Amino acid sequence: NAKMRELLNIAQRAASVSAPVLITGETGTGKEVMANAIRQMGPRQNKPFIAINCAAIQSTVLESELFGYEAGAFTGAEKRKHGLMEVADTGILFLDEISSMPLEMQPKLLRAIEEQTFRRVGGTTELKVDVQIIAASNRDLPAMVTENNFRSDLYYRLRVVDLHLPPLR
């Protein structure tokens, strides 16, 4: 239909410039399918596509999952682990259920998006990456921003390209 064609045209432009994309819509509208479509339309089609569901990972573990950690950074960290941001280098990092990301983690993600750099947990070296960020949510992020449950600066940084998927009913 016309709405989907319009969304795909916007997605095509987003893919060509590697801008951050925010995909919103009800559960089951195909947000991850759209993220994969963006990947297939752009120069990152043969590069890594790393998906992480922010709601499925404990807040205490999310930072080390995204950014990795150095040996000895915490109990049980016996050797260095690459984070998903590093694994996705030159490709796309898909952050599903971004609205579930804890507030204390949001400024770290914001900096990583803006600077395309980050530090592993327990590390001192800045690592540079080239990652397109695609985030998705089925929740009302503007309302969450108003209620101070989601950072406004991260919200606006993520929605450089804003795709709202219509319900499939």
Give the positions of each predicted feature.
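Short gly/ser/thr-rich secondary-structure transition/capping motifs
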Residues: 72-79, 115-120, 143
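Conserved helical "switch/dimer-interface" subregion of ABC/ABC-like ATPase nucleotide-binding domains
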Residues: 10, 41, 69, 108, ...
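Short, intrinsically disordered, charge-balanced linker/junction segments flanking boundaries
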Residues: 140, 147-150, 164-169
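Short acidic-aromatic loop segments in the C-terminal HATPase_c
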Residues: 99, 114, 159
